[in-house]
Amino acid sequence: MAALRRRSDRSAGLSFDADLGDRALTTARHDIVIGRWQGVRDLLRATGDHWPLRTHRIRALANAAAGSSVVEAWRAAEPDNPDAAVLRAATEVTRVFNGAIAAGHGAGTDRDRIDVAVMACLAAADARPGDPTPWASLLTVVRLYEGGVARSELRAWWEELRRRDPYHLEGHVQMLRYFSARWHGTHGSMYDFARDAAGAAPAGSPLPVLVQIARVEEYRYVSDAAKGRPVRGFGQHWNHELAVTELLRTYDRWLGGRVPGPIRAEEAAELNYLAHAACCAGLTREGAALVGLLGERIALVPWVYTGDPAQQIGRWRGGAPPS
């Protein structure tokens, strides 16, 4: 991935910012690199209960902290700080996923290790009762259990998240992945979940983009299974009639109802999915508009699944679709 990033940066003059323009987050992540937790504490305190921004920052901080003991040092210094408990839970989840990735596909994950992360999530939920973030972390890690979890248990945790934020995007994304064919469901169950959530979302909510995220998940699953071989009937995956109709619906409901203004860091990851869908579908107006709206807040995912991210983005810069 690092080699791809370097190659992409040179090929189109683009850079990929893991923090998506959130400079305060960049500073806090640098503190983690040098072993300091105080900047992380101050950042999360300042973030408060802005759930989308908090989720964006917690996720990035957990990725940065997973290979260090900074979170443990913070917990030791301030054992009663609820933000430290929330970040520790997210970090444990990241560590378990990192271990699963290192072990390779089909290797399985030690159940005791998953249990540790689950208990950290539940402890964080107790420490900060109004915060949906620990519940999103919990919904993320439980899909690593072989066979998943009991549907009643999953539903109970899902309702805990929704009581705190009924339109919590990260929580919805994690449930979508749980219901995907890659994990504990099917393409059909994943799309049903995405479409139901999108249909219930208020105007201006990013939740309709769940349908485009589901389309990426299906593409990854089918492509991985094909192992480079052509897949019959898959050539229109991005631009068949339903895909385009749903893409335009997301574009209208999310961006049409959104308060005008620059894209914020906490919106950018999911907006990359919508821009990617428009570009893959060959929608000239929407693709160029979305790439322009993103500006420099380009994420590697999901572009990396369909080729060189910088080359794909570069072809749409300046309003010109790919030839």
Where would I find each of the regions flagged by the language model?
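Short coil/linker segments at helix-helix boundaries
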Residues: 46-77, 90-130, 134-163, 170-200, ...
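Extended, hydrophobic/aromatic-rich amphipathic alpha-helical segments that build helical scaffolds
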Residues: 82-92, 275
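Extreme N-terminal leader/anchor segments
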Residues: 1-78, 288-323
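Fungal-biased detection of long, low-complexity, Ser/Thr-
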Residues: 236-323
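Alpha-helix N-cap/N′ positions at the starts of helices
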Residues: 20-23, 116, 153, 269-270
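Helix-start (N-cap) detector for alpha-helical repeat units in TPR-like alpha-solenoids
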Residues: 82-83, 132-133, 169, 205, ...
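Alpha-solenoid helical repeat architecture
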Residues: 205-212, 262-265
